[in-house]
Amino acid sequence: MYELKEKSYPMQPRERLELLGEEYLSDVELLAILLRTGRKKYSSLNLALELLQHFGTLDNFRKASISELKEISGIGQTKAIELRAMIELGKRIQTTTRKRYGQVLSSKEYGMSLAFEMQNFEQEHLTATYLDGQNQIIEKKTIFIGAFNHATASPREILYHAVKNLSVGLLVAHNHPSGNLQPSQADKIFTKKIKNACDNIGINFIDHIIVGAGNYYSFRERDSNLF
């Protein structure tokens, strides 16, 4: 069994979370925080590492029963129950989020929904919608408000949140306050940049939708060369 040394983690997980934010911690560090303690001569980091190595994947860990968790030395009845409670709470939070946001069934349905949602926006808004494998919406995020410069726009922030959310699919949308739905050349270039970036990291770029005057334009529906 590989053992983590203190020098591998110059700061303890709680300190790193407070300083950097939880998204910068490894799976081992996050689990170590939840475990709080290890066992004799064995830190919580080492116990967390052993747990994850034993089950192989986070999905297998998620499915582990109390008795299966207790097979690991240092995981007693109390810790096993606490871990199961943590896993169940995470599942319920995810389910609540999905119920709140709903599911994307088609570009038409979602385009018309966005057209209604953004119809009174006087400034241009760029939004990103992140989906799981069943097209359930994980998060809807406003990326930019104002005179959006497509020429200098980078997919980086959009994809940062996609990776953070473990997204399988991505929809991007922006409004034209003028009501003119026709995409500019800059819109087309931006769409291609996002599509290429998604392809490079294995995320399904579902569509780029333009909305205005109560209607929508779908690149997927209208521009087959891009999709």
From Swiss-Prot:
It comes from the Bacteria. Gene3D superfamilies: 5' to 3' exonuclease, C-terminal subdomain, Cytidine Deaminase, domain 2. GO terms for molecular function: metal ion binding; metallopeptidase activity. Keywords: Hydrolase, Metal-binding, Metalloprotease, Protease, Zinc. A motif (JAMM motif) lies at residues 174-187. Zn(2+) binds at H174, H176, D187. Disulfide bonds: none annotated. InterPro entries: MPN (IPR037518), RadC_JAB (IPR025657), RuvA_2-like (IPR010994), UPF0758 (IPR001405), UPF0758_CS (IPR020891), UPF0758_N (IPR046778). One of its GO terms (biological process) is proteolysis. Residues 103-225 form the MPN domain. Belongs to the UPF0758 family. NCBIfam families: PRK00024.1, radc. This is UPF0758 protein llmg_1515.
